[in-house]
Amino acid sequence: LLPYLPVTRTVLPNGLTVLVREDHGAPVVAIVTWVNAGYFDEPDSDVGISHVLEHMYFKGTPTRGVGEIARDTKASGGYLNAHTIYDHTAYETVLPSSGFLRGLEIQADAYANSLIDADELARELEVIIQEAKRKLDSPPAVALESLFALLHDQHRYRRWRIGDEEGLRLLTRDRMLRFYRNYYRPRNTILVVAGDVDTGEAIGHVTRLYGSLPDEPVERDVGPSEDTLPGFRYRELAGDITQTQVAMAWRTPGPDHPDTPALDLAAGLLTDGRGSRLYRGVRERELASQV
């Protein structure tokens, strides 16, 4: 078993939550900026904006030009990554621990000072629009997105997650900045440092780089709740594909509901791994190529 390594939690006066896990097993450190803003926080007029902002986050600040953040990180032996999901967006830097301070400075600069340059935004939107079009050519993606749209009438689950071409082309720099400045605030952010660092020194550096950021409330748009009874719904899509996709879903309670652990367990028994009931009942009988 791996040894238990405690996590030190600190909340700065401006509301930023800092989690540090000290682990000297390898000379590597990971820095993750976790912002509580994702697809659920987008109004219908701005579908996809959190994902676009993810693409723009490391695209330049007043002191670092376009491409410089990626070059500096790579020069330090590290790499950048990011992802957007329903309730958060996360930005990751992994690099040798000798470059920890430089990596943290880059993360802090991007977090507080991302320019979202208009010309760069226009170029990046073309990349994302092509990404959205590729999803239209992916039967599993189309099946999943169509399933969510069929299952929900009002909830933001119903929308195509990264947006479509028409909506993405309407995203301006002003709208991007408004979303960025509202949600990317210390009280709405968790900064995680894990790896070959000294906990006290790490917290000290974080305090110096992030502590002066203003503590401002987030104006959160939670979106509509789902108040209709779904009943049985069915949708069939036809296309020139080699394998049929079958997707099923049920509305369930939220994560805090007492029935949720039992539902998670049931889902695992049905679908997790080759020993699952669906795998044995469907895949082993050669009724499907995968479950």
Label every PLM stretch briefly.
Residues 1-27:
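N- or domain-start disorder-to-order transition segments that initiate the globular core
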Residues 15, 23-73, 258-270, 280:
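Active/ligand-binding-proximal structured segments within catalytic/core domains
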Residues 15, 33, 51, 73, ...:
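Buried hydrophobic packing residues in well-ordered domains
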Residues 23-25, 36-38, 61-62, 96-98, ...:
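Solvent-exposed coil/turn segments that connect beta secondary-structure elements
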Residues 24-25, 49, 82-86, 157-160, ...:
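Short, flexible turn/loop "capping" segments at secondary-structure junctions
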Residues 35, 61-62, 68-179, 224-226, ...:
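Acidic/histidine-enriched segments that form metal/cofactor-coordinating
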Residues 153, 157, 161, 166, ...:
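An aromatic/glycine/proline-enriched structural segment found at the starts
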Residues 247-251, 270-291:
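A structural supersecondary motif
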